[in-house]
């Protein structure tokens, strides 16, 4: 979650303190610049400023950085900055506004991995925000091409978590309402906005990828 000042600039200190708090309270990590973190509204310059300060956080190794932007070039540039600061795990939603199919989305992620080969990417499936809904076939193709890079998916469209089964791949529903069914089906946990307010009672174990406040 991003915390803003009265003038709508990013309050870096409070945002980092909040991220540390949810981890202290039991979450396995925190997503920086997810949808609840207002990823598409915060200027890239402010994101970079926060990332520079985030390097000093006591939980640096537990953050996943949301770098997905409508511009492929800006997405890659923000990832490069993040990598230079020691962050290696990213949450990336496909570009919004224009309509895309599986072919275009595979190309989008392929160009990212080809530009930054040493990274781990959690796909972000949220049709309501970006206009595209991942198919199982699309994800299977991406994992087949880049098994060391495409490590999981946050499923906020809920068309994947019941049926997507890939070895060494984490499926994380975006809501507590899907968590227990998801765990029964083999999901790894959740990435959820609710943890920002209730991190202590919704901490869960036996995960291959951390339960994350997003």
Label each residue range with its predicted role:
Residues 28, 33-36, 65-67, 151, ...:
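Short glycine-rich loop/turn motifs that provide flexible caps or phosphate-binding loops at active sites
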Residues 129-207:
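Catalytic alpha/beta core domains of metabolic enzymes, predominantly
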